[in-house]
Amino acid sequence: MKKIIVVGSTNVDKVLNVEKYALPGETLAINTYQQSHGGGKGANQAIAAARSGADTTFITKLGNDEDAKMMVKGFKADGMNIDDVITTTDQETGKAYITVDKSGQNSIYVYGGANMAMTPTDVDAHKSAIINADRVIAQLEIPVPAVIEAFKIAKEHGVQTILNPAPAKELPEELLKLTDIITPNESEAATLTGIEVKDETSMLANAKFFFERGIKMVIITVGGRGSFFATPDDHALIPPFPAKVVDTTAAGDTFIGSLASQLEIDLSNIRKAMLYASHASSLTIQVAGAQNSIPTREAILNVINQDQMTKTEIEKQKAQAAAYAAKLVPDHIVLGLGSGTTAAYFVKAINQRINDEHLDIQCVATSVGTEKLAEKLGMRMLDVNTIDQVDLTVDGADVVDHQLNGIKGGGAALLFEKLVADMSKQNIWIVDQSKYTDSLAGHILTIEVIPFGGMGVFRYLKENGYQPEFRFKDNGDILETDSGNYLINIIIPKDADLEKLSIDLKKQTGVVEHGLFLNVCDELIIGGDQIKTIKRSDLS
């Protein structure tokens, strides 16, 4: 069990639920006013750590008022050590006035109160708690000198320090030098470094700024894109977990507190800890409010287990679709082998059938990875340049809509996949149930570009309202396709005309291919205990 000290703010949240934010001079009526909910970044992070099983002590400063009594009662209920809570008669307990719109996004105005009265002397009076901790977490809703004092004590005694630089402000070099781990969100990172957070390249540039100031690990939360971590030797973007957004209040605090409860001091389990924290945040945003929305360890582990069960079921459905498709393949043909995890199931299934039934089937691959797998299995492979056409290609898809239009390219093989698909007399796609959707809007579309013209395409996409991002490998190098090109990801807009988008992209100098596969799939096979097949010829 991690022993965590949180030095930070406590606020009582006054929450307004609004349809939209008022313009200057505008008066709007509201239907809901939630009064006296516990909040404050320090308190939220402490509660998140405690509910995730950490031995948590909270050093905070409260007024001598009813709000303080309510907050302390809540701290006790969560099993936190409150021996180091400080009370003052000079200031009221801090308050936060929060508006939440119908999409769940929030704006927050903070009255510091007793929080802003915390001094280095206050912190020093509770140094024994810090000395005996594994790590100390602090934010910027208390005066910076108090944070510096806490971190000085920690560093003198080998205690790890985590700084959540929120709200963002210019920080003294002294504080940065005392910080082991820093956890800004994307706007806070940009404020501190002057580098806008747009993609993994800019995230890494932000991280290097902090590395140069002695910080050992940087974690940037990037909202719907997930969270990014970097050390001098490693970095990765951890995806978010899909959830219906009700209220984003306390999501970042939940992430930090739950992460701190799970992260080993040597940082060896960073990916696992961040996945845990991402699940915790996904639960938080589904509930209105701050501290009442912070999940327990049991709730987080339950959703993680459900996610693992879902992944297991998805793999089962992939294998079922692949096995069904393998039974449909006729003898004496040239067969196109798709790319990706679902196609790999098919390659193994058709190879088994070729061996069992002594079929005369020759194959072409749509990626180097598929070719290596097929050759390892001893399948008869052809060079695509030596044939005029392919009789049948079986491939997976990233997503398929009800008109059998799809997106491919998540596996970085979209050019070869499209070339073989165009050569094929028939194309069968195999997917699990999660890949079949009403619309391609909102999904990631991959665009393959030549390295020389990549930035020109990137600028075109940005100027036309997309948010393009280059694809990178885990080690930070730009991802190259089997043909040596780069990949750019965009999100398909809600109102996109797919045909027009396809044509417009192909017109751009530097674009080699894109991942929209329109009117290509002849038959879709969806895995499951009851296989579902959809043929283009049956569509109305």
From Swiss-Prot:
Substrate 1 binds at D253. One of its GO terms (molecular function) is ribose-5-phosphate isomerase activity. Its cofactor is Mg(2+). ATP binds at N185, T221, V222, G223, G224, R225, G226, G252, D253. SUPFAM superfamilies: D-ribose-5-phosphate isomerase (RpiA), lid domain, NagB/RpiA/CoA transferase-like, Ribokinase-like. Keywords: ATP-binding, Carbohydrate metabolism, Cytoplasm, Isomerase, Kinase, Magnesium, Metal-binding, Nucleotide-binding, Potassium, Transferase. GO terms for biological process: D-ribose catabolic process; pentose-phosphate shunt, non-oxidative branch. Residues 309-540 are annotated as: Ribose-5-phosphate isomerase A. In the N-terminal section; belongs to the carbohydrate kinase PfkB family. Ribokinase subfamily. This is Bifunctional ribokinase/ribose-5-phosphate isomerase A. It comes from Fructilactobacillus sanfranciscensis (strain ATCC 27651 / DSM 20451 / JCM 5668 / CCUG 30143 / KCTC 3205 / NCIMB 702811 / NRRL B-3934 / L-12).
